[in-house]
A protein has these predicted regions:
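Short, flexible helix-loop junctions that flank or precede catalytic/ligand sites
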Residues: 1-366
Length: 366
């Protein structure tokens, strides 16, 4: 049996899947609503895997892959979708993971984003971070925010991504999108150049290293609105991660810079729905939201990040919310199960406290 890569992609989209995995010695796998599922029982050979993977690559990409054994790129099927592609080697054969990217940028209502996220998109300057594990919808949240700016403001938007996922057609804004490996050698190089390209809005697809983080903070300090992502699971952890990247002799200065430039942190995760309706997306987003107030700015400046959680707890009137509060509310509304709520928190006792008497007895699933 011979597979065509575009047939597998179409089947993935038809089934509402998010990821396609190709590996020698296994059938293709789809991730649907967070769960991996083998597709059929035909085992892919190493040659079949390589043929499927190489059919998505141009000559330059093939040469890069043969030299480095790893590759990030994107691939589009007209009329279907675009895909983020990562190719790697395992047990001597090529394997790949393809993430389906919607060609339509979802709006705030469809994503279920709180109004405060929209409000933060309207800020003229500062640093806004969307954080969470891989596959938590960070890029989608950022896309909704950038799309709102594009539709409502005459700005120059510059993005640096690896790879470009959502394509923005200029509406009110001028939009330039740069892809790592095709348009720039590194995030840091692109950010250095960006400051000479008259941007109003800068999106950094991933703040991976000290130089990129330092440049993003500096750009926010100098009057730009900067969006970025980190693989952190909470607002306080995000602050610590940024500070810890720098050597100890620079950390005091960076705390001051961050306290002055940071606007908001949205730390998010996707939680399986309890009873999704037919055709409905099987996961729901849960966000911890930290808005920088003078009090939180002082906590960052003074290195008292352990107190940030309490500040978020008391900041509900400003639009702030802890992840635990959101999970508890979703459980009480019947949107998610108790097990799902507990699996997404590092503070299970807090979730249990917020759920209160509605929590199931020990050993009982709900």
């Amino acid at each position: 049996m011979e597979f065509m890569i575009e047939d597998l992609m179409e089947q993935l989209i038809d089934m509402g899947g998010s990821d396609l995995h190709l590996s020698a010695g296994l059938p293709p796998y789809f991730r649907i609503s967070g769960h991996l599922t083998p597709i059929g029982d035909h085992i892919l050979t190493a040659d079949q895997c390589q043929r499927l993977i190489f059919s998505m690559l141009n000559n330059t990409q093939r040469k890069t892959l043969e030299q480095t054994w790893e590759l990030d790129c994107s691939y589009g099927v007209k009329g279907l979708a675009r895909f983020r592609v990562n190719v790697y080697k395992e047990r001597g054969a090529y394997a790949a993971c393809l993430r389906a990217l919607s060609s339509k940028i979802p709006n705030f209502e469809k994503l279920g984003l709180p109004d405060i996220v929209r409000e933060m998109s309207e800020k003229p300057r500062g640093l806004i971070l969307v954080t969470g594990p891989t596959g938590s919808g960070k890029t989608t949240t950022l896309a909704a925010m950038i799309d709102l700016i594009n539709r409502t403001r005459a700005e120059h938007i510059l993005t640096v991504e690896d790879p470009v996922e959502f394509v923005y057609e200029p509406i009110k804004s001028l939009v330039h999108q740069r892809q790592l490996g095709e348009d720039t050698k590194s995030f840091a190089n692109a950010l250095k150049a960006a400051l000479r390209e008259d941007p109003d809005i800068i999106l950094v697809g991933e703040m991976r290293d000290l130089e990129t983080i330092a440049l993003a903070i500096s750009a926010a300090e100098t009057g730009h609105l900067v969006f970025g992502t980190l693989h952190t699971s909470s607002a306080s952890q995000t602050v610590d991660r940024i500070i810890d990247v720098f050597p100890s002799e620079r950390q005091t200065q960076v705390r001051v810079q961050l306290s002055n430039s940071l606007v908001a942190v949205f730390s998010q995760t996707l939680v399986p729905k309890k009873n999704p309706k037919p055709g409905e997306y099987g996961r729901v987003m849960a966000q911890e939201i930290m808005i920088i107030t003078p009090a939180i700015s002082n906590l960052i400046r003074e290195g008292k990040t352990a107190q940030i959680y309490s500040a978020i707890q008391t900041g509900g009137k400003l639009g702030m919310q802890t992840l635990e509060k959101v999970l508890a509310d979703m459980y009480k509304a019947g949107t998610i199960s108790f097990e799902s709520a507990m699996s997404k928190t590092s503070k299970p006792d807090e979730v249990q406290r917020l759920i209160g008497a509605t929590a199931p007895p020990a050993g009982v699933k709900r």
